[in-house]
């Protein structure tokens, strides 16, 4: 079991309160249809806002257990929707999955996250996203330097 809490006060010291336990779990694993595209997000509340096939990382890093499950289940399209401050992590994930010939979309959230913008606004951004090309990946890498 895993629990998390979120503050709705803008001036809160911590936005999220996660337990100090291993995060090596796949959030909402029982509800994921591995035959469809998946969306990788940072937190549980982001996954709830996305609604369909969203997997929270409980942070910014993707653990090997999730990578293995994605590969084992032959997921073809991976949408990466991490906050803007996690662009470097998004790029690493994208690069990894592109090297395995997967279709990757990085969803540009601007300065928001799915839980703040809501399902409809997120879905619009997801629909507008395009498959990541090598050239666009290099642009993102340049931005991070």
Which residues make up each language-model segment?
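Replication-associated primase and helicase/ATPase modules
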Residues: 40, 71, 76-81, 91-145
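Phosphate-handling DNA/RNA-contact segment within nucleic-acid enzymes
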Residues: 1-77
């Amino acid at each position: 079991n895993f629990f998390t809490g979120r503050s709705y006060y803008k001036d809160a010291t911590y936005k999220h309160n996660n337990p100090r336990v291993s995060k090596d779990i796949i959030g909402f694993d029982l509800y994921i249809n591995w035959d469809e595209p998946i969306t990788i997000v940072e937190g549980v509340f982001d996954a709830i806002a996305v609604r369909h096939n969203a997997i929270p990382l409980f942070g910014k890093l993707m653990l090997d257990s999730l990578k293995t499950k994605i590969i084992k289940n032959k997921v073809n399209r991976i949408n990466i929707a991490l906050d803007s401050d996690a662009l470097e992590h998004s790029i690493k994930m994208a690069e990894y999955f592109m090297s395995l010939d997967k279709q990757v979309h990085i969803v540009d959230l601007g300065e928001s996250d799915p839980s703040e913008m809501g399902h409809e606004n997120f879905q619009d951004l997801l629909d507008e996203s395009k498959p990541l090309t090598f050239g666009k990946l290099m642009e993102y890498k340049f931005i991070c330097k």
